[in-house]
Amino acid sequence: MIVTRFAPSPTGNLHIGGLRTALFSYLYARKTGGKFLLRIEDTDLARNSHDATKAIIEAFDWVGLSYDGEAIYQSERFPLYKEYIDRLIQEGKAYYCYMSKEELDALREEQRSRGETPRYDNRYRDFTGTPPSGVAPVVRIKAPLEGYIEFEDGVKGEMKIGAKEMDDYIIARSDGTPTYNFVVSIDDALMGVTDVIRGDDHLTNTPKQIIVYQALGFPIPKFYHVPMILNPEGRKLSKRDGAMGVMDYKRAGYLPEAVLNFLVRLGWSHGDQEIFSMEEMLRFFDPKDLNSSASAYNQEKFLWLNHHYITQTPNERLEELLLEFGCQPLSLGVREILYPALKERAKTLAELAQMLQEIVQTPSELDTKMLEKVGNSENGEILENYALFLESLESAGENPKILEEETQAFLDIHGLKSGKLFQSVRLALLGKGGGPGIFEIMAAIGKEESMARIQKASEIFKNRN
């Protein structure tokens, strides 16, 4: 059975790179009927944040990545790690090192002066003498002295690291706390993890972890090291490129479907297909198709995907989502008029909410540039006549089509072109240019409110000359 895991450190917000590897791990486990596990790597007690841990769980809930069983917290497993450290010492596979920081710094400086790569010289590897007093030892694991550490990476291919490149690295600090590569290896083994999908910034950790697996006789999982997400210029991704924490995307008005669809295509593909439902991701995903080259973050593509999913979202669900952006529920009739028009224009829920607020709220002022363009006494008279015309209508109600037909009759009677009227009406209704069609707006806010806004703008227009 395939068992994958996601193992974030709660020292900050969960970012999209982390969520991407979680998604890949989730898809592989679910596709094969396996298990997807969550482990919180909170051994850095000084930097851990309860809020960051909470945000990780919230992000999983938001995007719908369910994990099996309970989340595992490394901070609760220190006694377990100590058992395995003691076992390695007893079996002669790890040892106490009494080298002081000053001695280690001096050794490294000497090695650099000779043009060598700084590394521990194994001086306490087979030490049997009397330990120096006043030194709290660290524990080092015995790395192989010759040969190679080899593994087949599912993305990078065959990896081969010479023993001479490795040293006896520390698995327990002088205060007794275990180090990252040791606890990761213990947890992956005890959790039964068969496949590890993670960023290729972890590639150098893999041989260190394999040393632990081999020392304890644990099976070695299959590794997939995915290239990092870069910005469009090929550099490290940052907030300046539009990248944010996962929950920041929710607050900015992105849909979880869009986030997952965007991330799955950063490092994996299935032909030329761009739009993937979760069902399609599960059907097509295979880790052997993960790309070996880095993917670039494209904000415009992200917004395009988000717009697509907004247009596909049922109006009822959309209204629920917009409550978080300060929008009030609309009547069924108004909702069915406005939402189709607004969905076609909005790239985010935040944009949609802003457009909706601009429609339902009477504008406090009129856009200066638009007013300079159309705000004259002639257009003021046209608006006044149009308001009177609206007042005479009985059947228009909340039907944009009837409003459009009746307005065409008004244009014909007065010999006006539609553009001359529509620009002024739009400014009157919204206080600015742009936005959805004026007939949808008028049908949504009702005849009385439409007339009031148009009459007010008419007075402003006429008083400018």
Swiss-Prot record:
| Annotated positions binding ATP | 239
Instruction: Give a Pfam family name.
Output: tRNA-synt_1c
Where is the short sequence motif 'KMSKS' region located? Answer: 236-240
CDD domains assigned: GluRS_core (cd00808)
- Quote the subcellular location field of this record: Cytoplasm
Enzyme type, top EC level: ligase
- Sequence motif 'HIGH' region, location on chain: 8-18
Q: Which family does it belong to?
A: Belongs to the class-I aminoacyl-tRNA synthetase family. Glutamate--tRNA ligase type 1 subfamily.
Its protein name is Glutamate--tRNA ligase 1
* Gene behind the chain: gltX1
